[in-house]
């Protein structure tokens, strides 16, 4: 009764129980709460299409594994994929998300202009969003999962140059899809 403010409890008993809860550093079990509430949650992931062995494959597999674990907690994860080299594909995926009004969105912000438009709509609808792999800090995502690009580049260069002889040539290759 004290935990959930249900029913009458004397002030003396309430204070005694609250003191014990504080001493024990009591935290409610979010899984039990989710199961008891019977509310269903839907989260959407927006990731690039991928095949085994490609960069995004392990991320997709992680989402698949998490979705299986969360299913018993009334949490449904819907995955939407787009062609990472095609802005139209990304825009179509955004439109799909906006028609569904999920409880949250995890997305790879590959195209900045379209991502900005999506996050603006999500904010209007009070739908939280999280970025993965790339961060667009001015869009104020709830969270970001990925590397710190500057620090990663700095470390890579430092390791590359660690045993570098003064006469060595270094080549850097970067692929672009056309």
Give residue spans per PLM region.
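Short beta-strand->loop
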Residues: 46, 171-178
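Amphipathic helical "hinge" segments at domain boundaries
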Residues: 28-88
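Periplasmic-binding protein-like
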Residues: 98-109, 128-132, 169-174
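N-terminal helix-turn-helix DNA-binding module of bacterial transcription factors
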Residues: 1-38
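Hydrophobic alpha-helical segments within soluble ligand-binding/sensing domains
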Residues: 144-171
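Flexible loop/hinge segments that line or gate small-molecule binding clefts
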Residues: 110-152
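Short, well-structured alpha-helical segments in soluble
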Residues: 87-103
